[in-house]
Amino acid sequence: MFEINPVKNRIQDLSDRTAVLRGYLFDYDAKKERLEEVNAELEQPDVWNEPERAQALGKERSTLEEIVTTIDQLEQGLEDVSGLLELAVEADDEETFNETIAELEVLDGKLGQLEFRRMFSGEYDRANCYLDLQAGSGGTEAQDWASMLLRMYLRWAESRGFKTEIIEESDGDVAGLKSATVKIIGEYAFGWLRTETGVHRLVRKSPFDSGGRRHTSFSSAFVYPEVDDDIDIEINPADLRIDVYRASGAGGQHVNKTESAVRITHIPTNIVTQCQNDRSQHKNKDQAMKQLKAKLYEFEMQKKNADKQVLEDNKSDIGWGSQIRSYVLDDSRIKDLRTGVETRNTQAVLDGDLDKFIEASLKAGL
């Protein structure tokens, strides 16, 4: 006799995941309708009078076909594999049962590829990225929290095999960091981290309070992709304020001897970038300009997507100020406020175990 319940449960799991993709994540019905429209356009004899449009339609058809066909195959495959399981049980046939499990592996692989495609479908998801951390209200406690977040993300990046480079660190008044920027290098770095943008709330008994009272503090994270040099982003030099200063934080014995650190402020948006990781002021300025270009690009993308997000009834606030996760250390509870994912293993999360939170937000299409 076979263990059929685990197999039935797996079929149900694959069916549920397929239904989620078919529904609001990929909107299968709308894509199938659009595919019919695109096919009809491409069948018109005069379509190649506009070669660029024809090529764009061909590319769109390829994308739509892959999604529609894969979902069709998954639904048919799950129906077939359910029948195969029934046949195996009725005939008490181990070979057919093993064939059922093998077919499930194939379907799981197809579904996983489609889920991955949905999670990382953005234009810059494959890119390297920058992560800005900024201590919020809460003084020393918030600055210590910013340094804890930096450590958490560095550990996470290391566990994922990404390389990291500290671009800027501004030390806190007593402990921790006022701000930091880290570059995360590796395929899909931005895709993995983009939903981490927002405010992170810490609740704990402060080690900086002699009375041991409970404090609430905030630090913000902002993730933006490294953009190609050929991306056309107009920056008027008159809109920039460039300050040079002596670097603080890590950097060795020579770090404070020259004003090599550079801070660039884009006055119309009040976006600030800074770099201090090189002894050359010129190199630091180049890096800060690259970050500014990337940050302005992401800023514009967020503005363009704001109306779309409202129309899709996404309840998350647009922008950099929305609170995304609460870390209540005294109660041993970390909860994502967008997806409801929660854990009591707070130390593991602070040591970089973020995948369950990140994957849930990506699969939810945030």
Swiss-Prot record:
Q: Which controlled-vocabulary keywords does the entry list?
A: Cytoplasm, Methylation, Protein biosynthesis
Q: Where in the cell is it found?
A: Cytoplasm
Where are the coiled-coil regions? none
List GO molecular-function terms, semicolon-separated. translation release factor activity, codon specific
**InterPro entries, per database record:** PCRF, Pep_chain_release_fac_I, Pep_chain_release_fac_I_sf, PrfB
**PTM per UniProt?**
Methylated by PrmC. Methylation increases the termination efficiency of RF2.
Q: Which GO terms describe its cellular component?
A: cytoplasm
Which GO terms are recorded in the biological process aspect for this UniProt protein? viral translational frameshifting
Q: SUPFAM superfamilies under this entry?
A: Release factor
Q: Does the keyword Protein biosynthesis apply?
A: yes
Give all N5-methylglutamine modified positions.
Q253
Where it mainly occurs, coarsely classed, is cytoplasm
Q: According to its UniProt entry, what is the function of this protein?
A: Peptide chain release factor 2 directs the termination of translation in response to the peptide chain termination codons UGA and UAA.
| Family as reported in the entry's similarity comment | Belongs to the prokaryotic/mitochondrial release factor family.
Kindly give the NCBIfam families that the UniProt entry links to this protein: prfB (TIGR00020)
Q: What else is known?
A: The gene for this protein contains a UGA in-frame termination codon after Leu-25; a naturally occurring frameshift enables complete translation of RF-2. This provides a mechanism for the protein to regulate its own production.
| The name this protein goes by in its record | Peptide chain release factor 2
Q: What organism is recorded for this protein?
A: Yersinia pseudotuberculosis serotype I (strain IP32953)
Q: Organism classification, top ranks?
A: Bacteria, Pseudomonadati, Pseudomonadota, Gammaproteobacteria, Enterobacterales
* Gene coding for it: prfB
